[in-house]
Amino acid sequence: RGRFTATCDNGITRVFPKRGLRSGGALIYLHGGAYVYPMVAGQWGIVEGLIDRTGLPVIIPDYPLAPEHTATEAFDFVQPIIDEAQAEFGRVVIFGDSAGGGLALSLAMQRRDADERQVDGLVLYAPWVDVTMTNPCIEEVQPRDKVLRVPGLAWAGRAWAGDLDPADWRISPLYGDPVGLPPMRIFQ
């Protein structure tokens, strides 16, 4: 649309506003898709909105997806991207939607536990924080969700977990410790 410039290299897309670029930070956008689907057109609309509202560049890792890959591979792919963004831009906030929100939360917990430089904030939109799909309330919500179905999500969660237990906090951050995490906003 002419408002942005973008580069793509080694599975990392970087999108910049053509005008009004603010200094002092960047966003990393982790897309949703149940850890099995790539970005879709609507998610590019989210990226546009983030740039329009913040004036910051957005870095979009095309992280490895299940069932061909596992969460561990995605962690190994995204963590260096965070490090590089911090070195280049200083302040880094991760915006994750759905599965990307669960991934963002897991990455922040891992950085905390490894005493690595933490991101400056998390914005989580409807984060998928429990891939076990065992919460009894799911049956109440299921009829209202016309797209996502419990059996398919449970399969995706198991595929994403790989050799890890789906209830492991790195896979389902709901079971992790939130103490010491960066400031976060959660939208449902």
Summary of predicted features, one role per range:
Residues 1-7:
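An N-terminal hydrophobic leader/cap segment in hydrolases
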Residues 7-12, 16-188:
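Alpha/beta-hydrolase superfamily serine-hydrolase fold, recognizing
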